[in-house]
Amino acid sequence: MSSTYHGNLSISIFGQSHAPAIGVTIDGLPAGERIDMEELGHFLARRAPGQNRLCTPRKEADVPEIVCGAVDGVTCGAPLTAMIRNTNTRSQDYDTLRDVPRPGHADYTAQIKYGGAQDVSGGGHFSGRLTAPLCIAGGICLQLLRQEGIEIFARIVSIAGITDGAPCAAAVSGKPFPVVTDEIGEQMQQAILAAKADGDSVGGVVECVVTGCPAGLGEPMFGGMENRIAQLVFAIPAVKGVEFGAGFAAAAMRGSENNDAFCMENGEIRTATNNCGGILGGITNGMPIVFRAAFKPTPSIRREQRSVSLSRMEECTLSVPGRHDPCIVPRAVPCVEAAAAIAVYDALLEARKYQKTARD
């Protein structure tokens, strides 16, 4: 399985949803950086399951344990490995799914690729549970970026077609339900609960903003900042689309509307608008990076669906048992922040290599 991100950082995620533990190994972190474990724990708690009736009832503490790579809370230059123990699993809920794949889930494609050797319980390595170690890596990168004056925050833009059109604000990330407009957030929550009552699920959109990012990060072509961010965001299960700045809306604009006019602001070159989302030619221009990720509805639902029996090779119906989120979007907000943090910090490390080479 390809579960390693190769950049200036090498990030390898391991484990399965119902394995004894899940975790991550990060190679390439600078030595001498202190990791605030309390802050990291708070970040992971935003993603943790079992917090309220809007998410899965599976309860996991999600307390990260540093196995190696740090001494007294300070990175030592060796690869850093951290893990989270799985303590609340019910693998018997997935016995049926070994023969009848869930529509919309990776059960069928995993069966084709791995020939039945894959772990089905809880979705195995394909589970959203694996975003917890992604958040460990991203949470560490968030701390390191903050030292550079770079902040990353995300919020819910829409759920079930209900949209919060207000501009994103940094304070939103700390809310239990991270929306700008609380009244619209209440409507979103009611839509989630209505889908849950019907044995169904809903999807939505998360917007992420990166502020304080210097101009000049990223590369043209294959190493662009859009490429890097999108690659990591698509590591989050259920993400089906990513757009930057005006995104697909730019396709309906004229060039005179979409182009961001350059201007001077406090002695610095800025743009009057930000339709490009802070990136031009794959390289940051100093404006906030703005992107949105679209999440499909959770495929595991109690509502009866059509599927097939793999052993009998005939059509059948399936009602998915177990504990699942009626909407993954609220818990996905810190995951999007984590993915963005890894991409930006990785690009920052690369930029420093260029600067060192230029000086030498």
Segment roles from a protein language model:
Residues 1-360:
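Generic N-terminal targeting/processing segments that precede catalytic cores or assembly contacts
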